[in-house]
Amino acid sequence: MSGRVPWLDGARGIAIILVVLFHAGMFTVPTGLASPWWEPLNLVFALLRMPLFFLVAGMLAVGAVQRSWPALWRTRLAVLVWVFLVWTVLRFAYYQVVPEPIDLNQSSWTDFVLSVVRPSNGLWFLFALALFLVAAKALHGRVNRWVALAIATVASSVAHGGFTFGNVTYDGIMKYFVFFMLGLYLREPIIRFVHRRRWPATVALLVVFAAAIVLRGATGWFVDAATAVPVGLIAVAFGLCLSRNLARTPFTRLLSRPLEYLGRRTLQVYVTHILLLSTFTSVLMPFADTAVLTMLRPVMPVLMTATVIPVSLLIAAGCERVPVLRLLYAAPTWSSRERAGAALP
């Protein structure tokens, strides 16, 4: 199936909501604004949110990696590199002025200088995605796809088994490259698989995913390593089937359309939401023990997520009206053929 597949945008919408929810918990639990059980709950979705994001990115990159290097730069890489650099500077400048509500080490000059080769903040996804596109282009037509997938699977298993570089970016590259390549190489079989799965199969995938998470939690590192990719694929299959069924079922289309809208604007949310979460957390922290906020602790990450996503979109829409601010989310015309940047590639 060629052309745009709307439910893939819906899947990206699901993924970005889970990413924001994870970061909302990351800010609100340590500061006493949210219930502690949000930390293990967010860990449950670890094998869904980023694998889903990267697999869909791979599915949408099939045409891009077949283009020439200059075309790949203009249509995909330029916006990733530009936005990564711009927001790295913005985040560093922000945390030079505003204290961090939690210790993310975002104001370190050493980390800032090294960020072009060793990012250590939430923008690592952009760095990794650009690297994945370069790697996929370099491998295209030169390395057998099954060999590439086998190597990427082993790397992911090793990383999920406990191996670490001590850096979120390098660890993420090891863990998630396999999902990007699976999306890239198996786009059509994945689409056919999803199109044949209705609601009963979607629910069954959720049950299998939940059972697998419980079993993994009761085992050691070897089982964690060996099952990471298979369980991640079950989770991704659930996310894709959920998005597809929401889109094709009449009474759930009201949910799928906002998800698809959001999925086409993931870049704006991804780069903006952390600063908003940080700001809102800092504002609320002095009142963490008040009666109202104590009552809201069980749902605070959800409330934060429901707030920062639309605010991120509003900020981006406002910036779109001002030429110089438009460059916060799009590469300058001299570096890119497209003024792309609405959605992560």
Where are these regions (language model features)?
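Membrane-cytosol interface segments of multi-pass membrane proteins
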Residues: 1-154, 176, 288-345
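Membrane-interface helix-boundary motifs at transmembrane edges
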Residues: 2-5, 65-75, 135-146, 187-199, ...
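Aromatic-anchored segments of alpha-helical transmembrane domains
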Residues: 17-24, 87-89, 151-164, 205-218, ...
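Interfacial loop-to-helix transition and helix-capping segments at the boundaries
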Residues: 38-50, 113-127, 161-179, 213-238, ...
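Specific transmembrane alpha-helix
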Residues: 50-63, 125-137, 163-194, 228-250, ...
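Alpha-helical membrane-inserting segments
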Residues: 86, 90-94, 98, 135, ...
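Alpha-helical transmembrane segments and terminal signal-anchor/GPI-anchor hydrophobic tails
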Residues: 194-260, 275, 280-284, 291, ...
